[in-house]
Amino acid sequence: MNALDLPKAPHETRVVVAMSGGVDSSVVAGLLKRQGFDVVGVTLQLYDHGAASHRKGACCAGQDIHDARAAAEHLGIPHYVLDYEDRFRDEVIEKFAESYLAGETPIPCVECNRTVKFRDLLGLARDLDADALATGHYVASRALPGGGRALHRALDPARDQSYFLYATTAEQLDFLRFPLGEMEKTETRALAKELGLSLAEKPDSQDICFVPQGRYSDVIARLRPDAARPGEIVDLDGHVLGRHDGIVHYTVGQRKGLGLSGPEPLYVVRLEPDAARVVVGPRTALATTRIRLSDLNWLGEGPAEAVRDLPVAVRVRSTRPPRPATLTVGPDGAVEVVLAEPEDGVSPGQACAIYADDGPRARVLGGGTIRRVDALSARPREAA
């Protein structure tokens, strides 16, 4: 086996590297090239860059395409730029807008990985007769004794991206490789300098690529100019406290920007899109221990349908560590997560990544989209 767990000599092994123009994917390309693999770089143009082309901290911006091309030229590997704007708009941006209008808090990076990157780009890699598709994600992939591969949290906990990759299927994992999963970021930057890459000190991307300055409502207004409608801001008992200009301006757990005053801080507890209503309450009303999921991607042992009260750990936000929970998949396919301790600010539309345990290198068992959150103390929803 070579360094990528493939039964071929490196020079006979073609690897397509998804090059975003950042330091991580460029180092992956350089590292594999140095190890003797037949490396082909591919960069995806995903959206109309416009003003974001030169905006610092943006992912996949126009400058990144230039940087990816320059890195490939420096490394002496072929490089292709593919226009995936239509696919990205249909599979990611439009779904993002619909989810927000439904009162959810979507995670577009999960959908992008699920579709454009690990479905469409992986298919392209196969068309190029590649043996593997490698990316610069900080997540680990390990061979399983009985065949196939397992996904694990990265060595560098501060960089671990497993939360965004839970939807990767077992079939995709067989073809994917993540060389940075066993490295820390400082080591990656040191390798970039060693490889002579000019972007060794390039800042990491911070924003979602199509959301300038994190202003989601601006994106929704552009995509659905007539969708936002004003409505009431009410407390848990239905008393009107104020008005708003559209639920797209709010997300569960939000405190700032409500324009309300009172004896205690108020937070967005839930959004009711059919009534254009924002429900607010005290922080205690955000707590939940019971979450329902849809679109389960199962990477664990055995069929998902056999899972009953399985001890696991889950992450309901990328910034939070895995927390102990139990997982049950009902006979009808309903997926329920019961948390050992309450979590605050869990919103429909968010991702829930499932792990075998809460350890630093835990195996990823899959995950799903949060569809329902049962609050501990919130009043029952009024009938629509």
Curated annotation (Swiss-Prot):
<keyword id="KW-0547">Nucleotide-binding</keyword>
<dbReference type="InterPro" id="IPR023382">
    <property type="entry name" value="MnmA-like_central_sf"/>
</dbReference>
<dbReference type="GO" id="GO:0002143">
    <property type="term" value="P:tRNA wobble position uridine thiolation"/>
</dbReference>
<dbReference type="GO" id="GO:0005524">
    <property type="term" value="F:ATP binding"/>
</dbReference>
<comment type="similarity">
    <text>Belongs to the MnmA/TRMU family.</text>
</comment>
<feature type="disulfide bond" description="Alternate">
    <location>
        <begin position="112"/>
        <end position="209"/>
    </location>
</feature>
<keyword id="KW-0694">RNA-binding</keyword>
<feature type="region of interest" description="Interaction with tRNA">
    <location>
        <begin position="159"/>
        <end position="161"/>
    </location>
</feature>
<feature type="active site" description="Nucleophile">
    <location>
        <position position="112"/>
    </location>
</feature>
<keyword id="KW-0963">Cytoplasm</keyword>
<dbReference type="Pfam" id="PF20258">
    <property type="entry name" value="tRNA_Me_trans_C"/>
</dbReference>
<dbReference type="GO" id="GO:0000049">
    <property type="term" value="F:tRNA binding"/>
</dbReference>
<feature type="active site" description="Cysteine persulfide intermediate">
    <location>
        <position position="209"/>
    </location>
</feature>
<dbReference type="GO" id="GO:0005737">
    <property type="term" value="C:cytoplasm"/>
</dbReference>
<feature type="site" description="Interaction with tRNA">
    <location>
        <position position="137"/>
    </location>
</feature>
<keyword id="KW-0067">ATP-binding</keyword>
<dbReference type="GO" id="GO:0103016">
    <property type="term" value="F:tRNA-uridine 2-sulfurtransferase activity"/>
</dbReference>
<feature type="site" description="Interaction with tRNA">
    <location>
        <position position="350"/>
    </location>
</feature>
<comment type="function">
    <text>Catalyzes the 2-thiolation of uridine at the wobble position (U34) of tRNA, leading to the formation of s(2)U34.</text>
</comment>
<keyword id="KW-1015">Disulfide bond</keyword>
<feature type="binding site">
    <location>
        <begin position="18"/>
        <end position="25"/>
    </location>
    <ligand>
        <name>ATP</name>
    </ligand>
</feature>
<feature type="binding site">
    <location>
        <position position="136"/>
    </location>
    <ligand>
        <name>ATP</name>
    </ligand>
</feature>
<keyword id="KW-0819">tRNA processing</keyword>
<dbReference type="InterPro" id="IPR014729">
    <property type="entry name" value="Rossmann-like_a/b/a_fold"/>
</dbReference>
<protein>
    <recommendedName>
        <fullName>tRNA-specific 2-thiouridylase MnmA</fullName>
        <ecNumber>2.8.1.13</ecNumber>
    </recommendedName>
</protein>
<dbReference type="InterPro" id="IPR046885">
    <property type="entry name" value="MnmA-like_C"/>
</dbReference>
<dbReference type="Pfam" id="PF03054">
    <property type="entry name" value="tRNA_Me_trans"/>
</dbReference>
<feature type="binding site">
    <location>
        <position position="44"/>
    </location>
    <ligand>
        <name>ATP</name>
    </ligand>
</feature>
<keyword id="KW-0820">tRNA-binding</keyword>
<keyword id="KW-0808">Transferase</keyword>
<dbReference type="InterPro" id="IPR046884">
    <property type="entry name" value="MnmA-like_central"/>
</dbReference>
<dbReference type="InterPro" id="IPR004506">
    <property type="entry name" value="MnmA-like"/>
</dbReference>
<dbReference type="Pfam" id="PF20259">
    <property type="entry name" value="tRNA_Me_trans_M"/>
</dbReference>
